[in-house]
């Protein structure tokens, strides 16, 4: 279905018995995360918290809590996405089977981002960071965190949405030394597009403009975690997966996703860091406090009746397990084309997905060698370690 909002998706899930509403007041300090965790553990439905203590906004979680539910959300477009990836792997398929792939090519063209749409619901009102549900997931967390953010940045040398990056990098909203409502923490690791953008901005002594989107059509959230080739924009992918073009405007020089439920805009200043964390992470342990980039908040926008999406990470399996399964279904066949010599890969969920990847490769180039020693396999391993979300 072509959802135009997070709420449209949640109403569809509810209509099919895949969501329940929690009308009682729930505390964002540990209680919401605990409810989410217990429901996820038993394969339960998506959750809509209608009465969040200390906030006038509703919150939703466990949206992608099972692979079956994720497939249901994207039931009309998954096959099209898989065909698009097939075409990327083997463009000659469009020549050999033109009628089979004609619709896929047209869908990709129609999915290009749309600037300045007539409706801009996210600009309904300006709010403060402290108005957002301040969800504290684990007892030793350093503050409230955004766990389903879509963090947007642009290349200052090649500005524009088609050269932009959309990634899921955790955001700390409160705690530590952050000035309330004026500063937030931005945490990202190696091989992330935003790092390239910040490096270029730092070299020029310029601040990097960053926008953090939350909510909106569920395809936007998935696009932020997809390991996409550099030539495919996350926003175009979101348009294909969601069967609806990514809509955006520029406001005060910042990109704003008009279909998002919330948007935080701000600047990352060169060389300015603050302690971020601790945070109960994917491995079931706390990632400790370290210096990470500081984002100075410019504006915070919210649509009418906005819904704050969140998840809880920790010792696997968790909701991000379903993300990994969905991504593997869509992209698994692409890996052998991207990395020659690789036959199959498997990210081990029990290890937290990122730390352990199993790969089956081949030794093709030294059949004359009397003793088989890893050679091509080492090349493959280094290729994997340097490949975006596989690393």
Regions found by a protein language model. Name each.
Residues 1-294, 298-391:
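Extended, highly charged
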């Amino acid at each position: 279905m072509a959802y135009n909002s997070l709420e449209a998706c949640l109403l569809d899930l509810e209509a099919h018995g895949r969501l329940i509403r929690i009308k009682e007041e729930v505390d964002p300090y540990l209680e919401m995360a605990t409810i989410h965790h217990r429901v996820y553990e038993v394969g339960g439905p998506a959750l809509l918290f209608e009465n969040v203590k200390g906030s006038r906004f509703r919150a939703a979680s466990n949206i992608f809590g099972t692979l079956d539910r994720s497939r249901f959300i994207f039931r009309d477009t998954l096959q099209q996405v898989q065909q698009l990836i097939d075409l990327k792997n083997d463009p000659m398929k469009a020549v050999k089977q033109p009628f089979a792939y004609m619709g896929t090519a047209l869908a990709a063209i129609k999915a290009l981002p749309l600037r300045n749409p007539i409706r801009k619901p996210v600009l309904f009102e300006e709010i403060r960071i402290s108005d957002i549900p301040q969800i504290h997931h684990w007892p030793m967390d350093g503050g409230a965190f955004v766990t389903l953010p879509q963090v947007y940045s642009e290349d200052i040398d090649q500005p524009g949405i088609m050269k932009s990056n959309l990634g899921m990098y955790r955001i700390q909203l409160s705690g530590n030394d952050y000035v309330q409502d004026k500063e937030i923490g931005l945490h990202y690791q190696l091989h992330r597009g935003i790092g390239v953008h910040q490096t270029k901005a730092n070299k020029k002594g310029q601040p990097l403009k960053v926008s953090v989107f939350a909510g909106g059509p569920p395809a936007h959230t998935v696009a932020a975690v997809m390991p996409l080739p550099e030539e495919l924009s996350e926003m175009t992918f979101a348009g294909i997966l969601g069967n609806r073009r990514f809509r955006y405007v520029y406001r005060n020089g910042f990109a704003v996703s008009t279909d998002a439920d919330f948007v935080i805009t701000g600047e990352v200043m060169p060389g300015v860091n603050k302690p971020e964390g601790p945070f109960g992470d994917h491995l079931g342990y706390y990632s400790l406090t370290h210096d990470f980039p500081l984002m100075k908040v410019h504006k915070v926008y919210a649509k009418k009746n906005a819904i704050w999406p969140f998840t809880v990470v920790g010792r696997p399996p968790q909701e991000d397990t379903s993300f990994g399964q969905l991504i593997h279904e869509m992209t698994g066949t692409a890996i052998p084309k991207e990395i020659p010599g690789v036959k199959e890969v498997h990210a081990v969920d029990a290890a937290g997905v990122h730390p352990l990847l199993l790969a089956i490769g081949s030794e093709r180039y030294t059949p004359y060698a009397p003793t088989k020693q890893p050679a091509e396999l080492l090349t493959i391993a280094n290729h994997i370690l340097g490949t975006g979300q596989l690393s």
